[in-house]
Design a protein with these regions (language model features):
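Active-site loop segments of alpha/beta catalytic cores
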Residues: 1-27, 32-37, 83-86, 95-96, ...
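N-terminal catalytic or cofactor-binding beta/alpha core of small enzyme domains
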Residues: 55-56, 78-81
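Beta-sandwich/jelly-roll carbohydrate-recognition scaffolds of carbohydrate-active enzymes
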Residues: 69, 79, 85-87
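Extended Gly/Ser/Thr-rich low-complexity repeat segments
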Residues: 93-108
Length: 366
C-alpha cells in the first residue's frame, strides 16, 4: 500500500500517529534471487511485489547537485570473477562479480589541493543540473499525492569518493583547507540548484547518503562533523526548511551513535537504516532522542537466517514501541542477505503484519 504525502509527513514528523509504516529499503543481495528461485519463488516474490508493505508514494526531483560531466566508463579487464574499469571520476575500480553491488576504488584522483582544483569544475553550477521538464514532472507528481525528494552529496561520502577514507581522515588534520574547499564548492552548487527548485515546487524531503561508519563507530567524530559537515548541511537545510521542507534524512550504515547529537545539531531529523549488528537499536535510540528523530529500518537482517522463533522475538521487541511512538517506518536494516530462506522471509512479512496490526488495533490507530 502506498501512503500519500500528507499522511506520511504527518506520521514521520510526530504530528499524528497512525497505522504503522513498513518497507523493504534495499531489496535482495546479489545472489539471493537465484537462491529463492531454487526454493520455488514466484516472479512476484523475486521482485518483492508479492509482499505487503506500507510506504510513501515518492518522487525524486530530476536534478543533480554532485559530480557531473564525468568520463565514459572504460573496461580495462574482465574475467569470470571480476571487472576492472576506469569510472566516471577517473578512478580505477574493481567489481567482484556475484558478490558485490558496488565497485571498489583501487586509486583516487585527489591527494592535495592541486588535484582537487583539476576535479573542481565537475562540481560547479551549470544548467545541465536540471532534468528535462523537471518542474512540470514534479508538479504532476505532487498533484498525485507524491512525497517530493531532493538530494545532496554526503559531507563525508563525497570527499571519500574523491580521496578514499584514509586520506580523507588524515586530511582533516593535515589539509583542513582542502576539505573546507571541497564542501564549500559542493554547498554552493547545491544551494543554487535547490534554491531554484524549492522556489518553484514544494520540497518535502532532503536526502543525503553518508555511509561513514562501521561496526565499531564512525570515521568522523563529533568535532569533525561540527567543523566540516555542519556548515554544509546547514546552508542547504536552512534554505529548504524555510520553504517548508520537513524531513532531512541521512543514510549511513554502521554505528552512528557517537555522532548522532552532532548530526541533529546540523539539521538531521531522520536516519536509516539503523543496523542492529552495529549497535543501532531503534528502541534505545527512540528512548534517548524521542520526537527529535524519525527512524527507518531497524529490523536485524541477519535474524532472517535463523529460526522463526528468533525472527518473532526480534519483531516483538522492536515493533510494539515503534507502533506506540510513531515516526518509524520499520524494515530490514539493509539488503536481504544471501542465505535467507524464502520461507523465513514469507514468515517475517506475515509475522510483522500480525504484530503491527495487533498493536495498532490495541492503540486504536487509524
Amino acid at each position: 500500500m502506498e501512503v500519500r504525502r500528507e499522511d506520511y509527513l504527518d506520521y514521520m514528523t510526530f504530528r499524528r500517529n497512525q497505522r504503522p509504516m513498513f518497507t523493504e529499503i534495499f531489496g535482495p543481495l546479489v545472489n539471493l534471487p537465484d537462491e529463492w528461485r531454487a526454493q520455488g519463488a514466484t516472479d512476484a516474490e523475486i521482485t518483492l511485489a508479492a509482499f505487503r508493505y506500507r510506504r510513501p508514494m515518492d518522487f525524486r526531483v530530476p536534478h543533480e547537485t554532485g559530480f557531473v560531466h564525468g568520463r565514459e566508463e572504460e573496461i580495462i579487464e574482465e574475467t569470470d570473477e571480476h571487472v576492472i574499469a576506469i569510472d566516471a571520476m577517473g578512478r580505477r575500480v574493481r567489481l567482484c562479480k556475484g558478490a558485490a553491488t558496488q565497485a571498489l576504488p583501487m586509486e583516487y584522483p585527489v591527494r592535495n589541493m592541486d588535484d582537487w582544483l583539476k576535479i573542481k569544475p565537475h562540481y560547479l553550477f551549470d544548467e545541465s543540473r536540471f532534468g528535462e521538464n523537471w518542474q512540470a514532472r514534479t508538479e504532476q507528481a505532487a498533484a498525485a499525492g507524491r512525497f517530493i525528494t531532493v538530494q545532496i552529496p554526503g559531507g563525508f561520502d563525497e570527499p571519500r569518493q574523491l580521496m578514499g577514507e584514509e586520506q580523507l581522515c588524515y586530511a582533516c588534520f593535515e589539509q583542513p583547507e582542502l576539505i573546507h574547499d571541497i564542501l564549500s564548492a559542493i554547498a554552493e552548487t547545491a544551494v543554487r540548484v535547490l534554491d531554484r527548485v524549492s522556489a518553484a515546487v514544494q520540497v518535502d524531503h532532503l536526502f543525503v547518503h553518508e555511509d561513514m561508519a562501521g561496526k565499531t563507530g564512525p570515521l568522523f567524530g563529533p568535532n569533525q562533523v561540527a567543523e566540516f559537515i555542519k556548515p554544509y548541511y546547514r546552508r542547504v537545510w536552512d534554505l529548504l526548511a524555510e520553504r517548508g521542507a520537513q524531513l532531512f534524512n541521512q543514510d549511513s550504515d554502521g554505528n552512528m551513535n557517537p555522532v548522532l547529537d552532532a548530526f541533529l545539531d546540523a539539521g538531521i531529523n531522520c536516519i536509516h537504516p539503523c543496523e542492529p549488528a552495529a549497535g543501532m537499536d531503534i528502541v534505545a535510540i527512540r528512548a534517548k532522542y524521542g520526537r527529535r528523530l524519525a527512524l527507518i529500518g531497524g529490523i536485524d537482517k541477519h535474524v532472517l537466517r535463523r529460526s522463526k522463533d528468533e525472527i518473532a522475538a526480534e519483531l516483538e521487541y522492536k515493533i510494539p514501541p515503534m507502533v506506540a511512538s510513531g515516526a518509524c517506518m520499520l524494515g530490514l536494516d539493509h539488503l536481504i542477505p544471501n542465505g535467507t530462506p524464502l520461507e523465513n522471509y514469507r514468515f517475517y512479512i506475515d509475522k510483522a503484519w500480525e504484530i503491527m496490526s495487533r498493536e495498532a488495533d490495541r492503540l486504536g490507530l487509524e
